[in-house]
């Protein structure tokens, strides 16, 4: 497949996908949500999950969307990458999002979904010994992210802060 034929794999809200070079992988609409990229550099393969909430215990339905919650999304993404030929010991993580989109007068941590999402994802990653290589989290701006599996670069666009790469 030539570089001109490369596709951009789109990841929706509470969704997970896997992409292999030359394809890229992208998600948008990251406010308090977190985009977690897990990748194996040598295999030039990455998984991207758009996590909405920290804990599946918050689910109000019997049918659980595992990509929606940090405590289930990390394992789901790891499993998908292993099926795609990645090696667990080689997985690394990058993440973006977790903003506080709305300021509340209350100091109730329950309302701080963004920081709770980031903390829950990091907790899960530590259980699997997956290092966080870089992150762009917090703040009050929404983000769109795109990951390139060959260079392992995560491109981040925000309305207020412009573009950055980690």
From Swiss-Prot:
Hydrolase in keyword set: yes
GO MF annotations in UniProt: protein-glutamine glutaminase activity
Oligomer status and interactors: Forms a complex with CheC.
Domain of life: Bacteria
Keywords assigned: Chemotaxis, Hydrolase
UniProt key word Hydrolase: yes
Protein name: Chemoreceptor glutamine deamidase CheD
Family recorded in the similarity comment: Belongs to the CheD family.
InterPro entries with a match to the protein in the record: CheD-like_sf, Chemorcpt_Glu_NH3ase_CheD, Cytotoxic_necrot_fac-like_cat
A biological process term (GO) from this entry: chemotaxis
Known role: Deamidates glutamine residues to glutamate on methyl-accepting chemotaxis receptors (MCPs). CheD-mediated MCP deamidation is required for productive communication of the conformational signals of the chemoreceptors to the CheA kinase.
Record gene name: cheD
Region forming the signal peptide: none
Enzyme Commission code: 3.5.1.44
Reaction(s) the record says it catalyses: L-glutaminyl-[protein] + H2O = L-glutamyl-[protein] + NH4(+)
